[in-house]
Curated annotation (Swiss-Prot):
Name of the protein described by the UniProt record: Large ribosomal subunit protein uL30
One GO location term (cellular component): cytosolic large ribosomal subunit
Quaternary structure annotation from Swiss-Prot or TrEMBL: Part of the 50S ribosomal subunit.
InterPro entries: Ribo_uL30_ferredoxin-like_sf (IPR036919), Ribosomal_uL30_bac-type (IPR005996), Ribosomal_uL30_ferredoxin-like (IPR016082)
């Protein structure tokens, strides 16, 4: 699982549970359509799994 992941926030934070918002902030996603690069590791994969319905992930 070496490499990085490009994660893009595709849905807004309004009306979301505080745990979801906290997970997105820990990934660095605070605004709609913002893209961040994170290392491909189990911790990041777990956070992505929790918010999979709101983000788009590209391996790269």
């Amino acid at each position: 699982m070496a490499g990085t992941l490009k994660i893009t926030l595709k849905k807004g934070l309004a009306g979301r549970d505080q745990r979801i918002i906290a997970t997105l902030k820990s990934l660095g996603l605070t605004k709609l359509n913002k893209t961040v690069e994170r290392p491909d590791n189990p911790a990041v994969r777990g956070m992505i799994a929790r918010v999979a319905h709101m983000v788009e992930v590209q391996e790269g």
